[in-house]
Amino acid sequence: MASLLKVDPEVKLKVDSFRERITSEAEDLVANFFPKKLLELDGFLKEPILNIHDLTQIHSDMNLPVPDPILLTNSHDGLDGPNMKKRKLEDREETFQGTKVFVMPNGMLKSNQQLVDIIEKVKPEIRLLIEKCNTVKMWVQLLIPRIEDGNNFGVSIQEETVAELRTVESEAASYLDQISRYYITRAKLVSKIAKYPHVEDYRRTVTEIDEKEYISLRLIISELRNQYVTLHDMILKNIEKIKRPRSSNAETLY
């Protein structure tokens, strides 16, 4: 079959070397890195910063004071009766356009520093999981034999493993999107507070979003740990079929 396609011997040697490197790295990931990482993340979940029960402790100062109300008089020369009422309604509509903000009174509006600290620890863990899953996925894909009739149950287990690894990659990538959406949503709300400083609901919404993000970050760390547990367990239970898909009779997946 090799004669049907001419392959440069030097290139083939480099490809074989790459396959060996991927195999060695992936097997070490499954056997050693995954269990160590799940224990590390489990320990992270027990740290005090991730076990705050009173969520008011993660609230941050808006640094946007409520300005004194501006007193407006609705009396206009030469206007009284119905004309004056009409002018009052027009003035009221004009005052709801919000405040033009050219500079913040107390300087830059900072993010919630406690959440930023957690995010800066979580993001590298997310990227690491994506990278390691990609390596293990490539390893399993390289182990899939050529398509032929007969006992393909082991191949189906390999494909199932690849699908699970791909799902974990996608979910981990969605965590990064979630963090970006938090920053964007919070920035828009803070801008609203700057424009409408007297509206308390905007201020309350920012604290609600911070609380929600804190809970979400803890959930993300839990999911990262659980994904390491699941992948480690699934691959170990099926390692014989993954490495030698057609070496024995069909067995159940687990």
UniProtKB/Swiss-Prot annotation:
Acetylation at the major site Lys-195 is important for oligomerization and ability to degrade its target substrates. Deacetylated by SIRT1. GO terms for biological process: regulation of G1/S transition of mitotic cell cycle; regulation of proteasomal protein catabolic process. It comes from the Eukaryota. Pfam families: PA28_C (PF02252), PA28_N (PF02251). The modification N6-acetyllysine is found at K6, K14, K195. Keywords: Acetylation, Proteasome. One of its GO terms (cellular component) is nucleoplasm. InterPro entries: PA28_C, PA28_C_sf, PA28_N_sf, Proteasome_activ_PA28, Proteasome_activ_PA28_N, Proteasome_activ_sf. One of its GO terms (molecular function) is endopeptidase activator activity. Homoheptamer. Belongs to the PA28 family. Implicated in immunoproteasome assembly and required for efficient antigen processing. The PA28 activator complex enhances the generation of class I binding peptides by altering the cleavage pattern of the proteasome. This is Proteasome activator complex subunit 3.
